[in-house]
UniProtKB/Swiss-Prot annotation:
Name the UniProt record assigns to this protein: Dephospho-CoA kinase
Species in which this protein is naturally found: Jannaschia sp. (strain CCS1)
Top EC class for this record: transferase
Binding annotation for ATP: G12, M13, G14, K15, S16, T17
GO biological process: coenzyme A biosynthetic process
Amino acid sequence: MSFALGLTGSIGMGKSTTAAMFRDLDVPVWDADATVHKLYARGGAAVAPIDALVPGAMKDGAIDRAVLRAAIADDASLLKQIEAIVHPLVAKDRAMFRDIHSTAPLIILDIPLLFETGGDAACDATLVVTTSPEEQRRRVLARGTSEDTLHDLLSRQMPDAEKRARATYVIETDTLDGTRQDVAHLVSKLTEGT
């Protein structure tokens, strides 16, 4: 069975860029966000059950995330019900990924809320990517996100310091070259002797 490294980091910390660096080194990467998007897309396994729970959430055969967010804002109890639909489907997709890549020496499980959802229990080790609060803010605002939205997103995530304290490995993502070197070093370390 492959060594599973859970990858996480708060918004703007460089998680997607780091995941791409693992892919560039031919390490299979499973992306929780992409899986949820697939489940919400036309023909996705979550579409019908969510539409039954939140009438009108389906538009053109797919889940309209804005409608879903508005429904959750109106009735917070919906979130747990939606999670009860989505989480088992995500776990099934992750298990299929692990089966497909069972002979790979290393796989990455890219899970934004790794610690918050208990996803770290499915991992052999965890990696948190981090940068300074100033750089994080600069990156997120450069995407067109407002200060208020950034504050709201961060308030719903585990603080970076706590993530770093819980992580097996931490990579500072201040520079692309430094991050690339750290990723390559970690891949070598975790695949030595395989």
